[in-house]
A protein has these predicted regions:
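Conserved oxyanion/phosphate-binding beta-strand-loop segments in alpha/beta enzyme cores
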Residues: 1-36, 71-75, 102-105, 285-323, ...
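Alpha-helical recognition segments enriched in aromatics with Gly/Pro capping
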Residues: 309-315, 319-332, 361, 475-614
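Residue patterns forming the tRNA-binding/recognition surfaces of aminoacyl-tRNA synthetases
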Residues: 2, 11, 15-19, 91-241, ...
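Conserved small/polar residues in nucleotide/adenosyl-binding loops
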Residues: 639-646
Length: 649
């Protein structure tokens, strides 16, 4: 007797839905279990086998917890704003709302066909006005608390998508969305001050059950370092160049400085620079390079000495040359660095190329061959000579810097403030107004949600402005403070916005008066177990932890951390062992498997295909093996049932 999945699975899936057996009960007397999976982006391609693996582990845990007497919340929703839908809308002329609704309907039917035990009464959609009202509300609270600011800066810009990208969305110099080359462009950018929460994000990792590699990735992403800010005078002008260094003890070995090509001191003192034509030509070349290209460690060292300006080493008074070089960025640190070529390989290579002095200040290597980056006894360093422990020499130098007023201890982070605006249509409108009298003003809370207007042209302007900028009825408004004619902000939020708090809305998805009721939050939060992909442990998880910490400080949520536990699933590779992609023709459609072998076979195979956290190639033979196993289970069950019937008769 075989497992008759085409008869059995639809029957029980219908009964589950009719009886609402997977709906969670708020404030139950039972112990609670909140299992969370990363809600999907409802693409036109629909569900893939990666979704099956991502959801199957907590699906099993959730069913087990229900059998153990827990009140289980296992929700699903859709992270539906984003560029792919908008690009498809531009291509086809179909409104993103229509595309999104169709994709969500198809995706929901697919999920139900696979038999997941989601609570379908709590489905959320980030493009729903009742949802993004609260995304906008959180943004306004951040604006009130000074966590939102605007700055004109060089940004990562995708010419194909016509959108500004954060550093996180343009790694490797490629657009995360379309994989086109990213260019640098000067634009006004809205930022969220995530760096103000850097220490809380680091401290919070001590209180959660995350895999070590997840914690380490987040620690590395935040990139906290302790060091010193030091001021270098510039000879002949009333100006100081501030640098940050983690090794202030090596100041006696500084033989040159490097500043970013965009550093304002260049234009400010252009009349004193005798090779301004050469400087300008080099700056123009740098402007053509992406941040990724500029900061690559393995590349030819380029730079130009600034003739007419010299720095002064603050600890020994020696004059040192100042260069501009592409590897120094204004967005990192102070836009200026001190160079110690004897003990930093990049500085060493630069010094060798340009014939700059190399002074050893730490014994232990052969600086005629390469930089020495290890520890050792301090030499050629005046009051530090003889110090052998790095910690002691740094502390002594900090004392000297602070005593003389030329520097102080400080902290820097690799993580930068979050670039938060996009010049596209299909995203949450940023609820701010530009008034000629009052400056930037918040949209009043009672006017939320600030709705997306209906448009026919979704294409961004050639000037890089959002499609919303073309709609006068949306742009032109009245200042809520002074009543003057004003203009709305026309940029929209990035796709990461809606996913930064969605786990809270699941606890109270139909609340019109708050993002969630505090009693329900106290019952359900924190999430007991969150499963997802390794690709989201930095951006999404750090962003959502940041928002949650902010809401906790605001008194809106009851826990500082949103997720008590995190697990990671590995990729499902194609049968050929390569990553699945349409271009390679190795994509496996999960619904084809459901149709041929059944949903239970598919989920059984995904759970037994190998180490859950490892990348594993798809095997059709193993799928067949799982179906044979279920056939044997069915045969035993049918035999057992017939025996019972015989005894009963």
């Amino acid at each position: 007797m075989k497992y008759l999945f085409k008869k059995i699975e639809p029957k029980w899936q219908a009964k589950w839905e009719e009886a609402k057996v997977f709906e969670a009960k708020d404030n139950s007397d039972k112990p609670k279990f909140y299992g969370l999976v990363e809600f999907p982006y409802p693409s036109g391609a629909g569900m893939h086998v990666g979704h099956i693996k991502a959801y199957s582990s907590l699906e099993v845990i959730s069913r087990k917890r229900r059998m153990e007497g827990y009140n289980v919340l296992f929700p699903i929703g859709f992270d539906a704003f984003g560029l792919p839908t908008e690009n498809y809308a531009v291509k086809t002329g179909t409104h993103p709302r229509i595309i999104t609704d169709e994709n969500i309907k198809r995706f929901s039917n697919q999920l139900k066909k696979v038999g997941f035990s989601f609570d379908w009464n709590r489905v959320i959609d980030t493009t729903d006005e009742d949802y993004y009202k609260w995304t906008q509300w959180i943004f306004l609270k951040m604006f009130e608390k000074g966590l939102v600011f605007r700055d004109r800066t060089l940004v990562n810009y995708c010419p194909h998508c016509k959108v500004v990208l954060s550093n996180e969305d343009s790694q490797g110099g490629k657009c995360d969305i379309c994989h086109s080359d990213v260019v640098q462009k000067s634009k006004d950018v809205w930022y969220l001050r995530i760096t103000q929460y850097a220490d809380k994000l680091l401290e919070g990792l001590k209180d959660v059950d995350y895999p070590d590699n997840v914690k380490q990735q987040q620690i590395h992403w935040i990139g906290k370092s302790k060091g010193a800010f030091v001021n270098f005078d510039v000879d002949g002008i009333d100006e100081k160049l501030e640098i940050y260094t983690t090794r202030p003890d090596t100041l006696f070995g500084v033989t040159f400085m490097v500043i970013a090509p965009e550093h304002p001191i260049i234009d400010k003192y252009a009349d004193k620079i005798t090779n301004m034509d050469e400087i300008t030509a080099y700056r123009n070349e740098c402007a053509k390079k992406t941040e990724f290209e500029r900061t690559q460690l393995v590349k030819d060292k380029t730079g130009v000495r600034i003739q007419g300006l010299e720095g002064i080493n603050p600890v020994n008074g020696k004059k040192i040359p100042i260069y501009i070089a592409d590897y120094v960025m204004m967005g990192y640190g102070t836009g200026a660095i001190m160079a110690v070529p004897a003990h930093d390989q990049r500085d060493y290579d630069f010094a060798k190329k340009f014939g700059i002095d190399i002074i050893e200040v730490i014994k232990g290597g052969d600086i005629s061959k390469e930089a020495y980056t290890g520890d050792g006894e301090m030499v050629n360093s005046d009051f530090l000579n003889g110090y052998a422990k790095k910690k002691d020499s740094i502390e002594r130098m900090l004392e000297e810097l602070e005593k003389k007023g030329i520097g102080k201890a400080g902290v820097q982070y690799k993580m930068k403030d979050w670039a938060f605006n996009r010049q596209r249509y299909w995203g949450e409108p940023i609820p701010l107004i530009h008034c000629p009298n009052c400056g930037v003003v918040a949209v009043p809370e009672n006017e939320l949600p600030l709705r997306l207007p209906d448009v026919k042209d979704f294409e961004p302007g050639e000037d890089g402005q959002s499609p919303l900028a073309k709609i006068d009825s949306f742009v032109n408004c009245t200042c809520p403070k002074c009543g003057a004619a004003a203009k709305r902000e026309t940029d929209t939020m990035p796709q990461w916005a809606g996913s930064s708090w969605y786990f809270l809305r699941y606890t109270d998805p139909h609340n019109a008066n708050a993002l969630a009721d505090m009693d329900k939050l106290k019952y359900w939060m924190p999430v007991d177990w969150y499963n997802g992909g390794m690709e989201h442990v930095t951006r999404h998880m750090i962003y959502s932890r940041f928002w949650h910490h902010f809401l906790y400080d605001l008194g809106v949520v009851n826990t500082p951390e949103p997720y008590a536990k995190r697990s990671i699933q590995g990729l499902i590779l194609g049968p050929d062992g390569d990553k699945m992609s349409k271009s390679k023709g190795n994509v496996v459609d999960p619904l084809d498997i459901v149709e041929e072998y059944g949903a239970d076979t598919l989920r059984t195979y995904v759970l037994f295909m190998g180490d859950y956290g490892a990348a594993t190639p798809w095997s059709e033979n193993s799928v067949k093996g799982c179906k044979k196993f279920l056939d044997r289970v069915a045969a035993v069950s049918y035999t057992h049932l017939r025996a019972h019937e015989t005894l009963a008769n």
